[in-house]
Amino acid sequence: MTDTALIGSSCALGVFWSSKRYFDYLIDETNLSLLRGKEFGQAVIICPSLREGGTAIRGNTAPFLAQVKTLIDLLHEVKAERVTYITSIDTQPETGNELSPLLRETEDEWLAALVELKDFINLRFGRVLDFYLRWVTGTGAGMSVADLLAAVPEGTEELDVALLERHQLYPMHRLVRDVEKAWECGIFSVNLVPEPVTAFELVEQCFPSLVNRLPVAKETDPYGSARTSVYSTQYHDPDTGYIMDKQDVLAGLSPDKQS
């Protein structure tokens, strides 16, 4: 088993990954049947939850649920010596880490499907490295509040953001390097979580022309994400629980970096 496969190759993360590393098989929704009976030395599986971004999918979960079911059915017929699985961190509590019990809320079809797919992949294949992401920047697919703010049309309308909601903005350009480092370190579950920034901090420092369009803080505003990683020191020297500090996150999103 020496062939390699990237499952989810046509989404933003998959296109980026395949531009950095060679795969024998590039698999997406159009050719999933190629997986039947295949054996791979290595496979990268990108969860359908990260193909558009969780916010968009939650607005219409039916296609996502169908994708999960189809993927599980096909993966029953696949063998792989080593699997890298990229999935949503929504299955962890808002302040959780890799050791936190997963949220198994059966009444929430989105979370239930995420947990079902993660559990299946880890039981099906022998060596699996799980990566958890929340917001991803630089995809061009609106998968983070930063990308959405960058695309806001001119006007005076109030921004559709929660002022103090916490966002963990992971830059896509780090992904391949961070994954390979985890394999080198022998880690098998990693939260790729930078220090959170609020919508207010993000707009103030990276999109100052939008400051006057910010809403006021409301009691009903969501908390957001403040997950940490018990392995953060493998990526960032200070033992903060984050793989990047807030200053580096904001610097990478500054107007001159985006132009």
Locate the predicted segments by residue.
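Short, solvent-exposed loop/turn segments at secondary-structure junctions
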Residues: 10-12, 47-53, 89-92, 128, ...
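NAD(P)H-binding glycine-rich loop region in Rossmannoid oxidoreductase-like domains
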Residues: 26-98
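A conserved structural motif in NAD(P)-dependent oxidoreductases
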Residues: 168-174
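Mid/C-terminal beta-alpha module of Rossmann-like enzyme folds, strongest
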Residues: 176-233, 237, 241-259
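Glycine-/Pro-rich loop/turn segments that contact NAD(P) or position catalytic residues
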Residues: 69, 76-140
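Active-site regions of enzymes building and remodeling cell-envelope glycoconjugates
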Residues: 21-31, 39-45, 59-63, 97-102, ...
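N-terminal Rossmann NAD(P)H-binding glycine-rich loop of SDR-like oxidoreductase domains
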Residues: 1-23
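Conserved beta-loop-beta element that borders a ligand/cofactor-binding pocket
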Residues: 115-165, 188-191
